[in-house]
Curated annotation (Swiss-Prot):
<dbReference type="GO" id="GO:0005975">
    <property type="term" value="P:carbohydrate metabolic process"/>
</dbReference>
<dbReference type="InterPro" id="IPR019810">
    <property type="entry name" value="Citrate_synthase_AS"/>
</dbReference>
<comment type="function">
    <text>Key enzyme of the Krebs tricarboxylic acid cycle which catalyzes the synthesis of citrate from acetyl coenzyme A and oxaloacetate.</text>
</comment>
<keyword id="KW-0496">Mitochondrion</keyword>
<dbReference type="GO" id="GO:0004108">
    <property type="term" value="F:citrate (Si)-synthase activity"/>
</dbReference>
<comment type="pathway">
    <text>Carbohydrate metabolism; tricarboxylic acid cycle; isocitrate from oxaloacetate: step 1/2.</text>
</comment>
<feature type="active site">
    <location>
        <position position="175"/>
    </location>
</feature>
<dbReference type="GO" id="GO:0042802">
    <property type="term" value="F:identical protein binding"/>
</dbReference>
<feature type="modified residue" description="N6-acetyllysine; alternate">
    <location>
        <position position="100"/>
    </location>
</feature>
<dbReference type="GO" id="GO:0006099">
    <property type="term" value="P:tricarboxylic acid cycle"/>
</dbReference>
<comment type="subunit">
    <text>Homodimer.</text>
</comment>
<feature type="modified residue" description="N6-succinyllysine; alternate">
    <location>
        <position position="100"/>
    </location>
</feature>
<feature type="modified residue" description="N6-acetyllysine">
    <location>
        <position position="155"/>
    </location>
</feature>
<feature type="modified residue" description="N6-succinyllysine; alternate">
    <location>
        <position position="94"/>
    </location>
</feature>
<keyword id="KW-0808">Transferase</keyword>
<feature type="active site">
    <location>
        <position position="120"/>
    </location>
</feature>
<feature type="modified residue" description="N6-acetyllysine; alternate">
    <location>
        <position position="166"/>
    </location>
</feature>
Amino acid sequence: GAIDSKLDWSHNFTNMLGYTEPQFTELMRLYLTIHSDHEGGNVSAHTSHLVGSALSDPYLSFAAAMNGLAGPLHGLANQEVLVWLTQLQKEVGKDVSDEKLRDYIWNTLNSGRVVPGYGHAVLRKTDPRYSCQREFALKHLPNDPLFKLVAQLYKIVPNILLEQGKAKNPWPNVDAHSGVLLQYYGMTEMNYYTVLFGVSRALGVLAQLIWSR
């Protein structure tokens, strides 16, 4: 559809995606804001800064950033969390007890795997972007089964990771939550999640490019 200059970026974007639910527009405002930039050390932001430092065209700088985001270690994290949560729910069922969930987490770690959505290369506390999404979920979808599972993991996983002693940061990151919110509002096409990330990051990294010049 056509761009409506009276609406903000997020509202126009959700309209073009075919969504009319006001809460989804509110979620997209949150999502696009918290994913727009994150220091300069992650792959996509760093790449855009690096290419832009050569005075390359901003579109080329952003395209380079998206090539970095295409890498599974960077751009697929929230999808991997959602797949893991779905598998967990399938194996242990809904309304799982804390004890059974602890056993599942320990079995995951003892088999040499990690708990997706936990840990961060820089942060040493709960990712504030996770906290923003948690507040949104508590307000709009407190009884959603997947959100309840995410909230339950938040109570359990950090203590287990601290007890294990290997994680420098046992707290959840932004990817631990975003997929659950998108699924709730009907955006089930997980392959599109990285595109959302890219749309968001455009605002942050290109603003940085302008400031740098």
